[in-house]
Each structure stands twice: as structure tokens, then as C-alpha cells.
């Protein structure tokens, strides 16, 4: 009679990564709050560029957008000289988050608590009662004589604007943005942000109860779309028999999933036994799939580009958007979609992009599935942190491929994550 297996603790005190490589990811990588804080420090607040917005969101002097990097609130603002600045939304006096509006226009910033006033470049320019108050022949209060305005401005971030997209970093020693992306991913970035003026079409926002890395994984995972998503498998938008490529940067942190739409329909090789394939499904509004090739595509009908750690750039047929990942604790993140077109689009093109955008977002015909499976995955991780995922489709290796039946991009991401996090 064989010996009964010894039970492993469900909540290990000093957990260790299960072996070499990145094809087995422990559940505790998604559940440990101490690890999450380290991720914020090493991935969002140092050594990385993070997405903050699009120039088209702040076209005029004084226009601003409040957003976040990691959990730190920041403001992207266009100054009177036309420059783009990103400053932290924390008053230098008593630490209040002074900006409450998501979008607006301002001549300057001030904190309502004590009325400290800042320029749009983040410089402190006014302190009430700085020189005290005269009363009965004497001066009461006031700031010390050695108090200097220039030493008490808002925290200023380093800014990189390219092709209409804006990234920022708290780390002023971060590598140049182009080097951060690397030539392969920069090519796909420039494919979307190619210098044409952008036009904002709208926003979607959702809170997903799952670890933020799961959304990066989801868009680095070509294995699931043709299995999970009815729309993708039935109409050939994204499935295993599409012509495709997967590409990464040299450090494996960023990736591009590149696909050319197939004809859909019943290919037994890829739809046999697949529940998401609905042979009889038809669209009531054919405009949803009224796809017109655009010259800038250069062939592929879809490219999903993940820029680690903060954003996904989506081109899925004629729908174009950024998807901003905003962590909110180890088990939750906000996911903000900015849908856009181009300034030279006519009304017909704008409507086409808006209609196709219904595939995406929290109630989208495709993306609603992703939000649910991320939530349910997090529930499983919290239940038994000592267990691990299996990321072995396509083997254990990490590298570019010319097919989608693989999890190589996820293995690449965790190879990089382990090096940075020291796990």
C-alpha cells in the first residue's frame, strides 16, 4: 500500500518559486500583498515608462487629464507654451490629492485645503500668508525666511510623447522610450501612432476583481481567444487557423500578437468540440462586421500590443483603442479603454469604428468574457496560494512564433518578472 501524500500548507509562510523557468507560476504571485507592493516599486515607479494618455485628450493650453501610474494619482496637462507635463496629484504642503476632476481646463492648480497654488508645469507660485499677517503693529506667522518656493513644487515626472501617445516615469534615469520598447515593438507602436492626428471617440471603464498581471497575460495569450470567445471563433476574427505571428522585445516584457482574419465558418481542425463555435449564429446588424482594410495596417487585420506593465494598444479590424491597466491592490484593477479614430476620418469611418467598438469593453461581445475568467481565476488563486498554473502550451521555450497555439508570450513575461522581482 502506498504512503498517503503529505498535505502541503495552503498558505505557506516562506513560499518558493516552483523550480527553474517560467512555465509554472505559483498562485501566490497573484495573492501576496507584500509582493504587490514590490511590483509597484519596481515595475510602476522605477525603471519603466507607463502610459498616461493621448495628446488628443489635452489639445488646448490648460487642458488636463487626471489618471494614475500604479496607485499614484498623476495629472497630464498642456502648459501655455504647448508642452505636455505630468505631475503628481499630491500637494507639496500637506499631501492632499487636490485635483478631483477627471478632465478639465485650468489656468493653474491649487489645493483647496490651504490654497497653495501651482503653475501648469508644477512649480509652486503662491502660498497664502507666506509673509505673515500684520496685526497691532507686528507680523504674526508666516513661513520661515529660508522657505523657497522653488523647493516645494509638485513632483514632476519624465515625459515621452510619440505619435500622439504620452508615457511618463517617476524615474528620471529611465532609459529612452524608444530603447524601452525596442525596435520590434516600436515598429508596431508606430504602426498605430504614425503621426496622424487622433480623434477621441469615447471611454469605457470597469473594475475587475483580479490581479493586474492577469490582463497582461490575457492579451499575451493567443491560446484562448478561439476557445473562449464566440465572436472570434464563429466569425474568424481571431482563432487558431488565422495567419499569425507572435513577437517580443529582447527582454520578453513587451509583445505583439499579429493576426490576419480568416473566413470563419466550420474548420473541423479548430472548431470541433469547441463550445464557443456557434455555426448558426448570424449578426442582426451587419455593420458590426463591416470591415474595410486600411492602408496603414500593412496586411494584418489585428495587432494587440502589450507594453509592460501598464497598457495594451488594440487594433482589432477598424476599432482602435488603448487599454490602461490601473492596479488597485493585489486582487483588483481598473481597466480604462480610450477609443479613438483619426482626425481625417469622415463620419462614415467614425461610425464604423464606434460600431465595431461594441465587441469590446465591459459589456462587449468579446471582452465581457475576459473580465469574468479573470475574476474566477483570482478566486481560485485565493483559495489555495500554494498551487501553481501550467503555462506549457508550445513547450517550455521562449521565443517568437508564426502560430498561435502557444503560451510563449506569458512565459516570456514571467521570465522578465522573475528577474526584476528577484523571485
UniProtKB/Swiss-Prot annotation:
<feature type="binding site">
    <location>
        <position position="111"/>
    </location>
    <ligand>
        <name>[2Fe-2S] cluster</name>
    </ligand>
</feature>
<dbReference type="GO" id="GO:1902494">
    <property type="term" value="C:catalytic complex"/>
</dbReference>
<feature type="domain" description="Rieske">
    <location>
        <begin position="49"/>
        <end position="168"/>
    </location>
</feature>
<dbReference type="Pfam" id="PF00848">
    <property type="entry name" value="Ring_hydroxyl_A"/>
</dbReference>
<dbReference type="GO" id="GO:0051537">
    <property type="term" value="F:2 iron, 2 sulfur cluster binding"/>
</dbReference>
<keyword id="KW-0479">Metal-binding</keyword>
<keyword id="KW-0560">Oxidoreductase</keyword>
<dbReference type="InterPro" id="IPR043264">
    <property type="entry name" value="AhdA1c-like_alpha_C"/>
</dbReference>
<protein>
    <recommendedName>
        <fullName>Salicylate 5-hydroxylase, large oxygenase component</fullName>
        <ecNumber>1.14.13.172</ecNumber>
    </recommendedName>
</protein>
<keyword id="KW-0614">Plasmid</keyword>
<keyword id="KW-0001">2Fe-2S</keyword>
<keyword id="KW-0520">NAD</keyword>
<keyword id="KW-0503">Monooxygenase</keyword>
<feature type="binding site">
    <location>
        <position position="370"/>
    </location>
    <ligand>
        <name>Fe cation</name>
    </ligand>
</feature>
<feature type="binding site">
    <location>
        <position position="229"/>
    </location>
    <ligand>
        <name>Fe cation</name>
    </ligand>
</feature>
<dbReference type="GO" id="GO:0034785">
    <property type="term" value="F:salicylate 5-hydroxylase activity"/>
</dbReference>
<feature type="region of interest" description="Disordered">
    <location>
        <begin position="1"/>
        <end position="20"/>
    </location>
</feature>
<keyword id="KW-0408">Iron</keyword>
<dbReference type="InterPro" id="IPR001663">
    <property type="entry name" value="Rng_hydr_dOase-A"/>
</dbReference>
<dbReference type="InterPro" id="IPR015881">
    <property type="entry name" value="Ring-hydroxy_dOase_2Fe2S_BS"/>
</dbReference>
<feature type="binding site">
    <location>
        <position position="93"/>
    </location>
    <ligand>
        <name>[2Fe-2S] cluster</name>
    </ligand>
</feature>
<dbReference type="GO" id="GO:0046244">
    <property type="term" value="P:salicylic acid catabolic process"/>
</dbReference>
<comment type="function">
    <text>Oxygenase component of the salicylate 5-hydroxylase (S5H) multicomponent enzyme system which catalyzes the 5-hydroxylation of salicylate to gentisate. Active only on substrates with a ring-substituted carboxylate group with an adjacent hydroxyl group. Primarily active against salicylate and substituted salicylates, but not against 2-hydroxycinnamate, 3-hydroxycinnamate, 2-hydroxyphenylacetate, 3-hydroxyphenylacetate, 2-hydroxybenzophenone, 1-hydroxy-2-naphthoate, 4-methoxysalicylate or 2-hydroxyacetophenone.</text>
</comment>
<feature type="binding site">
    <location>
        <position position="91"/>
    </location>
    <ligand>
        <name>[2Fe-2S] cluster</name>
    </ligand>
</feature>
<dbReference type="InterPro" id="IPR036922">
    <property type="entry name" value="Rieske_2Fe-2S_sf"/>
</dbReference>
<dbReference type="InterPro" id="IPR017941">
    <property type="entry name" value="Rieske_2Fe-2S"/>
</dbReference>
<feature type="binding site">
    <location>
        <position position="114"/>
    </location>
    <ligand>
        <name>[2Fe-2S] cluster</name>
    </ligand>
</feature>
<dbReference type="GO" id="GO:0005506">
    <property type="term" value="F:iron ion binding"/>
</dbReference>
<comment type="pathway">
    <text>Aromatic compound metabolism; naphthalene degradation.</text>
</comment>
<comment type="subunit">
    <text>The salicylate 5-hydroxylase (S5H) multicomponent enzyme system is composed of an electron transfer component and an oxygenase component. The electron transfer component is comprised of a ferredoxin reductase (NagAa) and a ferredoxin (NagAb), and the oxygenase component is formed by a large subunit (NagG) and a small subunit (NagH).</text>
</comment>
<keyword id="KW-0058">Aromatic hydrocarbons catabolism</keyword>
<feature type="binding site">
    <location>
        <position position="224"/>
    </location>
    <ligand>
        <name>Fe cation</name>
    </ligand>
</feature>
<dbReference type="InterPro" id="IPR015879">
    <property type="entry name" value="Ring_hydroxy_dOase_asu_C_dom"/>
</dbReference>
<dbReference type="Pfam" id="PF00355">
    <property type="entry name" value="Rieske"/>
</dbReference>
<keyword id="KW-0411">Iron-sulfur</keyword>
<comment type="similarity">
    <text>Belongs to the bacterial ring-hydroxylating dioxygenase alpha subunit family.</text>
</comment>
